[in-house]
Amino acid sequence: MKEKSVKLQRTESLLKEVIPEALSTLSDTRLNSLGVVEVDCSKGKYHAEVYLDAPFATPEEKREILRQLRLAEGTIRDHCLSATGWFKCPRFHFNFDDSTDKANRLDAIFEQLKKERES
């Protein structure tokens, strides 16, 4: 895997800060509480994969949240443009990050193995 340029890393870092601000300005309370885990921009910065964390949302709620985010993408992009002073903003593609769920399941398995070894 190639290393990302410093400029691309800076863009991703800035988006990781600005997107939660943009989400907090929306009227939908489900979107206000979302956490941004990671932002991964394409090389040309035309697209950005935004990985979100909503630990207590059911799969149905997650589908609805993604639908609402697609509808609010223009507002989020406008906020990012005004907050950063950029002339263009990448198109956002929202996904839920399930790595924390996987890590929690692995921790539970390791804890169970530890208890079995002790007994």
Swiss-Prot record:
One of its GO terms (biological process) is maturation of SSU-rRNA. Transmembrane segments: none annotated. Its main location: cytoplasm. This is Ribosome-binding factor A. NCBIfam families: PRK00521.3-4, rbfA. One of several proteins that assist in the late maturation steps of the functional core of the 30S ribosomal subunit. Associates with free 30S ribosomal subunits (but not with 30S subunits that are part of 70S ribosomes or polysomes). Required for efficient processing of 16S rRNA. May interact with the 5'-terminal helix region of 16S rRNA. Gene3D superfamilies: 3.30.300.20. Belongs to the RbfA family. It is found in: Cytoplasm. The keyword Repeat does not apply. The gene is rbfA. It comes from the Bacteria. Monomer. Binds 30S ribosomal subunits, but not 50S ribosomal subunits or 70S ribosomes. GO terms for cellular component: cytoplasm. Keywords: Cytoplasm, Ribosome biogenesis.
